[in-house]
Amino acid sequence: MPTIHYHISDLRVALRPYRTAQRIALVPTMGNLHDGHLELVKIAKQHADIVVVSIFVNPTQFGVGEDFDSYPRTLDEDVAKLAMVGADYVFAPTIDEMYPVLPPPTTILAGTITEQLCGKTRPNHFDGVGIVVSKLFNIVQPNIAVFGQKDYQQLAIIKQLVRDLSYSIDIIGAPIIRATDGLALSSRNQYLSESERQTAPILQQELQYSAKQISDNKQPLEVLLTAAHERITSAGFIIDYLEVKTTELTAVDDESINNHQDLVILVAAWLGRARLLDNRLVTINKV
């Protein structure tokens, strides 16, 4: 079983012997772990000697009316799952341990990259992500950290944060893990009713179809995205966004599309109580 620490000072003492000759990996999570999280741990073990998994439902990244209070807390089950994949340490701090003052007087503002996509409807979300990830980096001082590519914008922001703040940490983006029907695994999938769960894979099917159309580059992006938006909406989703970006999350249009080898199509959509995220990388077929 992994060793559980609840206090910053205890975790630092536990990790001190490894810092000289061994590599430490961090896998930050909010708990309620599924196979996607466990895959992050497996990847971390391939790149490091010691794997630390943080489990902390971070209040600073939730907005008013979001699901902070109802977000599942399943620490005992999570630790049992982490034991099966060989995690070494679990860091499960309280809110008071992480934030002596809440909201914290110090903030991390990641700039314009946060103002698009999820940032449009969750305006303070990535500020909260920035502060908690920075704190975890300072507490654990890992050599590597592993994040899932499902949260594509978050991954891009964390890479920027590491670069801008000169952290000596290698960031690994892990591929999206999907259910057998293609739905991207997410802790919030459990909010789906039985009928909604049957509908949910349509989201990735539409992404896959649209990615192929973008790759072939045979019709304007606006036409393609409008048609996809209509199909997704008619299936019962409420779309937050459906956009095509460069892999660095800069804007792209029909005039500039051939300047890029790779793009990404990203979607966030509500289905009942569940806000689902997904994305697909797109390689442009050059004529």
From Swiss-Prot:
Residues that hold ATP according to the record: 30-37, 148-151, 177, 185-188
Signal peptide segment: none
SUPFAM superfamilies from the UniProt entry: Nucleotidylyl transferase
InterPro entries attached to this UniProt entry: Cyt_trans-like, Pantoate_ligase, Pantoate_ligase_C, Rossmann-like_a/b/a_fold
Record-annotated active site: 37 (proton donor)
Name of the top EC class for this enzyme: ligase
Residues annotated for (R)-pantoate binding in this entry: 61, 154
CDD domains (alphabetical): PanC
Domain of life, per lineage: Bacteria
Keyword field contains Electron transport: no
Residues that span the membrane, as ranges: none
Reactions the enzyme catalyzes: (R)-pantoate + beta-alanine + ATP = (R)-pantothenate + AMP + diphosphate + H(+)
Pathway this chain belongs to: Cofactor biosynthesis; (R)-pantothenate biosynthesis; (R)-pantothenate from (R)-pantoate and beta-alanine: step 1/1
A Gene Ontology BP annotation from the UniProt entry: pantothenate biosynthetic process
Compartment(s) of residence: Cytoplasm
GO cellular component, one term: cytosol
Subunit details: Homodimer.
Function: Catalyzes the condensation of pantoate with beta-alanine in an ATP-dependent reaction via a pantoyl-adenylate intermediate.
PANTHER family named among the record's database cross-references: CYTIDYLATE KINASE/PANTOATE-BETA-ALANINE LIGASE (PTHR21299), PANTOATE--BETA-ALANINE LIGASE (PTHR21299:SF1)
Further information: The reaction proceeds by a bi uni uni bi ping pong mechanism.
Protein name: Pantothenate synthetase
The organism of origin for this protein: Psychrobacter cryohalolentis (strain ATCC BAA-1226 / DSM 17306 / VKM B-2378 / K5)
